[in-house]
Amino acid sequence: MAPGQDWSKTWTFYKGDWHEGNIPIMGVRSHAAWLCSSVFDGARTFEGVTPDIDLHCARVNASAATMHLKPVVSAETWEGLTRDGIKRFDKDAALYIRPMYWAERSGTLLVAPDPDSTQWCLSLYEAPMRAAEGFSITLSPYRKPSMETMPVDAKAGCLYPNNARALIEANARGFGNCAVRDMLGNVAELATANLFTAKDSVVFTPAPNGTFLNGITRQRVITLLRDAGVSVVETTLRYSDLENADEIFSSGNYSKVMPINRIDARSLQPGPLYRKARELYWAFAHD
C-alpha cells in the first residue's frame, strides 16, 4: 500500500494482547528484519467460513521448524486465537489470516538465527475476495529454486522476492501472472498460486518435486475432484502443455480457485472442470 494510505482494518495478537492497526513488531537489530528469518501462513475467512484453518495453523509450525525457529505456539492455540480475532470484525467481512514466526537475535554463527529468540504474532485484516473474472498468464524467464538452494519446503518470507520479480516482469508485458519453471524447465506453479490444466476431460497439475510448496488449497481441490470422479494426474508439465490445454485454472489460499482467461495471445474461457473445482471447493468450505 502506498505511503500515507490507510491500511485496511487490522487486528494483531502480539505479546499477549490484541492491538489494532499496523503495529511495529521488529527493530533495526532484529535478525528477521535484515536476514529474513521469518515464516508465515495464510488462511482465509469469507462468507462466514474458515476452510482448513487447522491445516494452516499446523503448517506455520512446520515452516518454523524448517527455518530453525522454535514453533512455540500449538496449532490449537493458533486456531483458538484466530477464532477470537475474527470476532473483532463484521461477521460478513472477508479476512486474510496470517500467523508468523521470526527470529529476534542472531545465534553464535551470527548469520544463523537464535532459535530461543523466536517471536510470533497473529494478524488478521480485511482483504476482499477477488471476483472470479480470471487473469492472464505468460512464461516467466525466472526459475524456481530447488531444496538444495532455498527453503522451499517452508512458507518463508525469503522466497517471495523471487515471486515478486517474476510478477513485475510479467506485468510489465501486460500479464496478470506467470508460469514459473523449475531448473529443469518443467512448469512448477504460477508466481502466486498452484496451477491446474485440463485436456480431454482430465485435470493435470505439476507433481510436487521440491521446488514449490504443495499448497493446502491445491491438495483440497485434488481430493474434491477425485472424490467427485474426476481424473486428476500429478505429473511433469512443460509450458507447451499449458499452451495446448483446454482449460487452465489456479488454486491458492488468497483467491481460492480462479480461471485463467488468457495465455500469451490465446484467449480461454472458464471451462467445466474449472467450474466443477470451484463449486466443489465452495461446497466444502460451507459444509
Q: How should each PLM-predicted stretch be described?
A:
Residues 82, 88-100:
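Ordered, amphipathic secondary-structure segments that act as subunit-interaction surfaces
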Residues 1-84, 102, 108-287:
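Helix-start/capping segments and mature chain N-termini
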